[in-house]
């Protein structure tokens, strides 16, 4: 009976098997991410910062502050990864020994700023928005955390190595790794093999198609946060000489737990922190007046993350 049905439908067993395998491959999360973020890649491809960084057009002070932006980003990301290390939608991707960057970034911060570096650094508002988004996802929609982990770490294992060499050459940093510990993955012997292993783990996550589509959407959102940094930089660069960047761009002070801020708590209700700035941040901007280099730093740091995708 079953043989007659297969014949009448015109589909034999080998063809049906091939169709099933092709369908599974097309539904793999890694493939969906690759295709679903292609437009974002194309838009980022022409970013001036990407081209300048590859040419080695970066000053040491900007690179120092770019490291600061990375520190805040990875501190948030790894805090949420630790929080969700047992969550079924993320546990298979939890590799703190191999991937976590906070400790390495701490060494870089000490190299650039000295032992009291924590007293000297803060995060621009545009970069802080991404940090807040990561915290929101980790606490409320952990199934989407893979979008941020995959975007960052897979890029770091790829193009990050190119950026390390560019930075060492352009800034005359020690070849022994001081100032570029962020790019050194001591517990990953073969980056290409590890990336393949990570993608396989990601594809094996028990997720329905709707959740996978949401993950792709979240990855694109991460790119948009990067673009907001570039937009902020454009506005700062076009500000009249009489108008300081600090007057145009409020910042968060980067200390304490931002999630205790009443404005942040209210934003959590809506699922995102967008729109007007926190009044506290605006006040802090007036009182503390961070330098233009801080804004540039955050832009370079996130541009580096975008560039890393092109070498995956």
From Swiss-Prot:
Q: Which CDD domains match?
A: HemeO
The answer to whether UniProt assigns keyword Metal-binding to this entry is yes
| Sites bearing Phosphoserine, chain numbering | 2
- List the SUPFAM superfamilies hit by this protein, alphabetically: Heme oxygenase-like
Compartments annotated for it: namely: Microsome; Endoplasmic reticulum
- Sites binding heme b sit at 41
Quote the catalytic activity from the record: heme b + 3 reduced [NADPH--hemoprotein reductase] + 3 O2 = biliverdin IXalpha + CO + Fe(2+) + 3 oxidized [NADPH--hemoprotein reductase] + 3 H2O + H(+)
Where it mainly occurs, coarsely classed, is: other
Query: What does the similarity note say?
Result: Belongs to the heme oxygenase family.
Q: Under what name is this protein listed? A: Heme oxygenase 2
This protein's species is Oryctolagus cuniculus
What lineage does UniProt assign to this protein's organism?
Eukaryota, Metazoa, Chordata, Craniata, Vertebrata
């Amino acid at each position: 009976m079953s043989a007659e049905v297969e014949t009448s439908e015109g589909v034999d067993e080998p063809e049906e098997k091939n169709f099933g395998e092709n369908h599974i491959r097309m539904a793999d999360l890694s493939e969906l991410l690759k295709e679903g973020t292609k437009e974002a890649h194309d838009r980022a491809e022409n970013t001036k910062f990407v081209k300048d960084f590859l040419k080695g057009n970066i000053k040491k002070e900007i690179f120092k502050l770019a490291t600061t932006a990375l520190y805040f980003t990875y501190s948030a990301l790894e805090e949420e990864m630790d929080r969700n290390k047992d969550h079924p939608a993320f546990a298979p991707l939890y590799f703190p020994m191999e991937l976590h960057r906070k400790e390495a970034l701490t060494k870089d911060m000490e190299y650039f700023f000295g032992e009291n570096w924590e007293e000297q650094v803060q995060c621009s508002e545009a970069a802080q928005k991404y940090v807040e988004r990561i915290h929101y996802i980790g606490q409320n929609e952990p199934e989407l955390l893979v979008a941020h982990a995959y975007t960052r770490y897979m890029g770091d294992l790829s193009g990050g190595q190119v950026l390390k060499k560019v930075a060492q050459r352009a800034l005359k940093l020690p070849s022994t790794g001081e100032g570029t510990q962020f790019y050194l993955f001591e517990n990953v012997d073969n980056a290409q093999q590890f990336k393949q292993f990570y993608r396989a783990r990601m594809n094996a996550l028990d997720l329905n198609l709707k959740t996978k589509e949401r993950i792709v959407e979240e990855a694109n959102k991460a790119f948009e946060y990067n673009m907001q940094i570039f937009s902020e930089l454009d506005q700062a660069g076009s500000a009249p000489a009489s108008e300081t960047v600090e007057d145009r761009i409020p910042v968060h002070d980067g200390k304490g737990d931002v999630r205790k801020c009443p404005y942040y708590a209210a934003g959590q209700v809506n699922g995102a922190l967008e729109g007007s700035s926190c009044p506290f941040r605006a006040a802090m901007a007036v009182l503390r007046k961070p330098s233009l280099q801080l804004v540039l730093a955050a832009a370079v740091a996130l541009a580096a993350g975008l560039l890393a995708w092109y070498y995956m």
